[in-house]
């Protein structure tokens, strides 16, 4: 549903029918990601192709149950870059984190209901994701605080 690639981990917001479906989906994601990352790391290097684990831990799951929690999770995942910059250095001039699915998120304050795909650099290949099926992640998250601004800083004390 939404994702953000960090330096040493990945943030995901996913929907699953139950714990078994979540575990199966996450296992499939980790296997596929490990194969692709190992191939990319090995590309052009002599010797055997890199193999093995890419993710040292399994995953941490948190069940989202309220509109406020859903909005916070969406903001945190898609604007995580600003959270890091707020703690560790100068802010980027990027409005969006190009290493996330933020470019395809339809709930930005700045574009209302009109825009669905922000323009990126000419060589940018956006991370496309499925749109949510559940009411909570499709529209319920807007109930309390409305749409999300790309200028917000997640978890910043106000």
Identify the residue ranges that each predicted region occupies.
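Short Pro-Cys-Gly-centered "Cys-loop" motif that presents a nucleophilic cysteine in a tight turn
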Residues: 1-7, 16-158
């Amino acid at each position: 549903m939404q994702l953000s690639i960090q330096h040493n981990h990945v943030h995901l917001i996913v929907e699953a029918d139950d714990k078994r479906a979540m575990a199966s989906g996450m296992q499939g994601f980790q296997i596929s990601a490990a194969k692709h990352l190992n191939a990319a790391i090995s590309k052009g290097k002599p010797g055997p192709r890199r193999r093995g684990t890419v993710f040292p831990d399994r995953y941490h799951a948190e069940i989202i149950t309220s509109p406020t929690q859903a909005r916070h999770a969406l903001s945190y995942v898609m604007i995580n870059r600003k959270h890091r910059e707020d703690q560790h250095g100068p802010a980027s001039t990027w409005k969006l984190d190009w290493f996330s699915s933020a470019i395809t998120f339809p709930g930005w304050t700045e574009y209302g209901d009109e825009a669905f795909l922000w323009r990126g650099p000419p060589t940018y290949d956006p991370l496309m994701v499925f749109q949510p099926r559940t009411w909570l992640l499709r529209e319920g998250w807007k109930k309390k605080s409305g749409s999300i601004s790309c200028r917000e800083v997640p978890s910043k004390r106000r």
